[in-house]
A protein has these predicted regions:
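Membrane-proximal helix-turn-helix segments that form the acceptor-binding/catalytic region
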Residues: 144-176
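Carbohydrate-associated surface elements
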Residues: 182, 204
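Conserved donor-binding/catalytic core segment of Leloir-type glycosyltransferases
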Residues: 177, 227-243, 249-252
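Aromatic "clamp/platform" in nucleotide-sugar-dependent glycosyltransferases that forms part
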Residues: 312
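Glycosyltransferase donor-sugar binding loop
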Residues: 205, 236, 249, 263-276
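Nucleotide-activated donor-binding/catalytic signature segment of Leloir-type glycosyltransferases, i.e.
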Residues: 275-298
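Short hydrophobic beta-strand element within catalytic cores of glycosyltransferases
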Residues: 329-332, 339-342
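A short helix/loop element that forms part of the nucleotide-sugar donor recognition site in Leloir-type
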Residues: 211-226
């Protein structure tokens, strides 16, 4: 039985999506942090492939797993979710519910009514306006400021609706965690959230052993039939527009004219056929891995020579943290969130996106310039890689993340 003196932390999770995105990595690391604190943990997992609700204990942690809903996300079925909490979770001043998915204002409100003594914590892993606006927070501010005019635009109307829901969530909960300074500024300057409610806690990652000798790296490459003289440029993540995939492919087409010994590895869900056909002429130089489990992806971090993160928007990217942990020299955009993680000529080469349009040749040209700098200088590659590793150790270790959440929980 849990101690009456300990806080009871209920971490809400979604089984299917957590196996494929950064929220799953975050929850894994958060649970590691909480295990090192004087708290009791309950991992609440929705949409599990099983026929009934199950409650068990594992490794000193309580687990409540809930089967899949007939349709929609678990937060769309908030009435059922609330019944589950009323059945299995007694209200208490020591309870802290940690929400990681959005938008779910109805669920938060219903839980506030059924469990008025319990605290609520909302960790922002995504702001829904960032994808359609390609991370342009200045445009968001203009849309919100000119609300009446913006409502006449279909896309802007949808954005305002999601902003309203996110704002409602922030107002309902007791604390909001943002992962980057950029999100903190949006919450304070555009959403107008009380700063005392906001906690800036960047993601952290447990330190792992990584292959750092050329001999070990080459042995791993042999298993994947990659020549030791070939320079591997690694992109990891969803192959979508807001992740900057088209800018990378266009840049790689240009790079091949100067560098014949390079390979682009795309570790993520496969591109549609009509997109692949546009880049058929470079297909022998591009490796598509499909979605990879973390264990397999780590091998590519070890084999790669350069990491590229061309996203228009991120929320403290775990791909970025993992690349830094492995000491990769990184080329990144100055997109929303990324500009808080990386400093140009420090732990990465940061390239400006420029205008956020579908055919932005300037962005691709900037990527070409940055990648050329690294490919042309082993010294620069080593320097950026060392700085990346130092940045990980200083800012993104599990210890720093644990201290942030301990500070937050102590404030309750």
């Amino acid at each position: 039985m849990p101690s009456e003196l300990n806080k009871q932390i209920y971490v809400l999770d979604e089984y299917i999506t957590s196996t494929k995105n950064g929220i799953g990595v975050f929850i894994t690391e958060l649970l590691q942090c909480l295990k090192k604190m004087d708290v009791d943990i309950c991992h609440v997992i929705f949409n599990v492939r099983q026929p009934e609700i199950r409650v068990c204990s594992k490794n000193g942690m309580k687990i409540i797993s809930i089967p899949r809903f007939p349709s929609g996300n678990f937060f769309d079925n908030w009435k059922v979710v609330n019944r589950v909490f009323r059945l299995f979770v007694p209200d208490s001043l020591e309870n802290v519910f940690c929400f990681n998915h959005s938008p779910c204002p109805e669920l938060l409100e219903s839980l506030r009514n059924s469990h008025p003594l319990s605290k609520q914590l909302y960790v922002i892993h995504n702001l829904w306006w960032t994808s359609p606006l390609l991370g342009d927070d200045c445009l968001l501010a203009n849309i919100v400021k000119n609300r009446s005019r913006s409502l006449k635009n279909k896309t802007y109307k949808w954005i305002l609706n999601t902003v309203d829901k996110e704002l409602q969530m922030c107002q309902t909960v007791d604390a909001v965690v943002c992962l980057t300074k950029g999100t903190h500024q949006v919450l304070t300057n555009i959403y107008r959230i009380d700063q005392e409610k906001i906690f800036l806690i960047p993601n952290g990652l447990k330190r792992n052993q990584y292959i750092n000798s050329k001999m070990d790296k080459n042995k791993l490459r042999e298993q994947y039939y990659i020549d030791d003289k070939e320079k591997v440029i690694l992109f990891a993540g969803r192959l979508s527009e807001f992740k900057g995939i088209y800018a990378v492919l266009d840049a790689f087409c240009i790079l091949l004219k100067e560098f014949s010994n390079i390979r682009l590895v795309l570790a993520g869900s496969l591109l549609p056929e009509f997109v692949l056909s546009n880049y058929a002429h470079i297909s022998t130089k591009v490796t598509y891995t499909g979605h990879l489990e973390r264990k397999e992806l780590k091998k590519w971090y070890q084999m790669a020579d350069i990491g590229v993160i061309p996203s228009y928007t991120e929320q403290c990217s775990y791909v970025g943290i993992e690349m830094m942990m492995h000491g990769l020299p990184i080329v990144t955009s100055d997109g929303f969130g990324l500009r808080d993680m990386f400093k140009d000529q420090g732990n990465a080469i940061v390239v400006p996106i420029g205008k956020r349009t579908k055919k932005n040749g300037t962005f691709s040209e900037n990527l070409v310039h940055a990648l050329t700098m690294l490919l042309s200088s082993e010294t620069l590659m080593n320097e950026i890689g060392r700085n990346a590793r130092k940045a990980y150790l200083k800012h993104y270790g599990l210890c720093q993340m644990k201290e942030g959440y301990k500070r937050l929980l102590d404030a309750f």
